[in-house]
Amino acid sequence: MAVGKNKRLTKGGKKGAKKKIVDPFSKKDWYDVKAPAMFNIRNLGKTLVTRTQGTRIASDGLKGRVYEVSLADLQNDEVAFRKFKLITEDVQGKNCLTNFHGMDLTRDKMCSMVKKWQTMIEAHVDVKTTDGYLLRLFCVGFTKRRNNQIRKTSYAQHQQVRQIRKKMMEIMTREVQTNDLKEVVNKLIPDSIGKDIEKACQSIYPLHDVYVRKVKMLKKPKFELGKLMELHGEGGAGTAAKATGDDTGAKVERADGYEPPIQESV
């Protein structure tokens, strides 16, 4: 029998003794997520990110994060079937400033609307806003029974479906093309576009449950900090005064470490 130490056992023992358990959360920081000024509740919650270490900067890890929030939480409302996507575009101090990134209906709402004995009409269109955002809007609507109808089914003819789809596309294009992103979001919150489509299509075939069911962000213009600050109600006292219709101006929340954008001309 060879006399000597068992190298494998001693080596393994040393390795195990050296290893230290480090809590990963000790290297992370919490940041507040702020919604744009279009919504009633600005503070969405908190997000976690690893602290700045060497070339890895914390704010770079936060930019581009997408948060899906129910409209009920944003507006302090009970109607909770709309979900808004918000994307972090800039970090000011401990605040993540977000912008609109998309909208969707919840699955249970979509499933509750689809029923037998009616026609489902869908349309989609790609439209550019006045400030250069390219959006794809999807619309859905359902035929309904007339007041004096005896027949069980309420199916629309193919020609009527085509007319309604054309009307949907026209109204969506008109409403988005003539407005900037902020005004479009203000129309999506109460879904005034869906109500306009419902009214316009009454003469072709009566509809109900007409909604802009989805909005996708296809292209964005070049990022400008000044425009993002305006969305968050921080574009200066002049713009705030115009919005409120008051000469004194409105009090706005400033993010920690906020610096006003440099103006090209005075």
UniProtKB/Swiss-Prot annotation:
Domain of life of the native organism: Eukaryota
Compositional bias of kind Basic and acidic residues: 244-257
Keywords per UniProt: Cytoplasm, Nucleus, Ribonucleoprotein, Ribosomal protein
A Pfam family matched in the record: Ribosomal_S3Ae
Any one GO MF annotation of this record: structural constituent of ribosome
CC annotations in GO: cytosolic small ribosomal subunit; nucleolus; small-subunit processome
Sequence segments annotated as region (Disordered): 236-266
Chief site of localization: cytoplasm
Keyword ATP-binding: no
GO biological process: chordate embryonic development; ribosomal small subunit biogenesis; translation
Quaternary structure and partners: Component of the small ribosomal subunit. Mature ribosomes consist of a small (40S) and a large (60S) subunit. The 40S subunit contains about 33 different proteins and 1 molecule of RNA (18S). The 60S subunit contains about 49 different proteins and 3 molecules of RNA (28S, 5.8S and 5S). Part of the small subunit (SSU) processome, composed of more than 70 proteins and the RNA chaperone small nucleolar RNA (snoRNA) U3.
Similarity comment text for this entry: Belongs to the eukaryotic ribosomal protein eS1 family.
Protein name (Swiss-Prot/TrEMBL): Small ribosomal subunit protein eS1
The gene coding this protein: rps3a
